């Protein structure tokens, strides 16, 4: 863990309220796929998961939902390229088990996708042959982000597939990530779950009922 400043390189709008912030990665800053950093705003600290792979040495990325009036959100909303931002980290025990050979199931809702994206990129960039399935849930079509990136990755890597589900669509299929995973064969899987508490609890219970032991069910509540 270290205190450091990182220069903001770029800001990309992913949805109406989600932004991708890319920072220069300072020398000596290392992390495991799935961990988070604390953004320092005066006397207040806010936790944000790193959404990039540790193998990306030049930069690191945060995916942030901007909340009206939120200290971290308002600070980042006003941030401009070349600004230096104060951080502390990395933190967290929600990270990839690199020694496992089990299939990987990534389940996320909203910006709970961020640490899962880090894990996904790391696995694919490191040449892992483990089967990887991603299940991503949001409310509306306009809340979906990174779809094109997932489509591109799934075309390049035969061991990766993904599904996106909407809980409040204007039309078409409606459901939750818990509905999606019930259709899957997860016997030899390791689950990484990140999102709201109700979803995390439901998915944990499902994997437990399927006989997956606790050490193979990793979770973080957003």
Task: Indicate residue ranges for each PLM-predicted region.
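Conserved S-adenosyl-L-methionine
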Residues: 101, 122-132
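Phosphate- and divalent-cation-binding pockets in alpha/beta enzyme and binding domains
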Residues: 95, 115-118, 145, 202-203
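A short, basic/flexible loop-to-alpha-helix module at the beginning of a structural domain
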Residues: 89-101
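Ferredoxin-reductase
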Residues: 2-83, 139-140, 168-169
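Short, conserved phosphate/pyrophosphate- and ester-handling motifs at nucleotide-, phospho-/glycolipid
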Residues: 34, 112, 196
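Reductase modules of NAD(P)H-dependent flavoproteins
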Residues: 135, 139-222
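Histidine-anchored nucleotide/phosphate-binding helix
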Residues: 113-125
């Amino acid at each position: 863990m270290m205190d450091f400043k990182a220069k903001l390189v770029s800001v990309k709008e992913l949805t109406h309220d989600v932004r991708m912030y890319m920072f220069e990665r300072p020398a000596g800053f290392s992390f495991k796929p799935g961990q988070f950093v604390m953004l320092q705003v005066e006397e207040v600290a806010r936790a944000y998961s790193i959404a990039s792979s540790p193998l990306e040495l030049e930069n690191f990325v945060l995916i942030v939902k901007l909340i009206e009036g939120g200290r971290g959100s308002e600070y980042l909303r006003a941030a401009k390229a070349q600004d230096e931002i104060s951080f502390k980290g990395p933190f967290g025990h929600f990270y990839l088990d690199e020694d496992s050979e089990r299939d990987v199931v990534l389940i996320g809702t909203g910006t709970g996708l961020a640490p899962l994206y880090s894990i996904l990129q790391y696995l694919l960039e490191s040449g892992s042959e483990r089967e990887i399935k991603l299940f991503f849930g949001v409310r509306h079509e306009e809340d979906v982000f990174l779809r094109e990136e997932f489509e591109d990755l799934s075309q390049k890597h035969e061991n990766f597939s993904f599904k996106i589900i909407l809980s409040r669509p204007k039309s078409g299929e409606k459901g939750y990530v818990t509905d999606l995973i019930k259709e899957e064969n997860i016997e030899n899987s390791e689950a990484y779950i990140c999102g709201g508490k109700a979803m995390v609890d439901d998915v944990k219970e499902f994997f437990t009922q399927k006989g997956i032991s606790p050490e193979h069910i990793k979770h973080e509540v957003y």
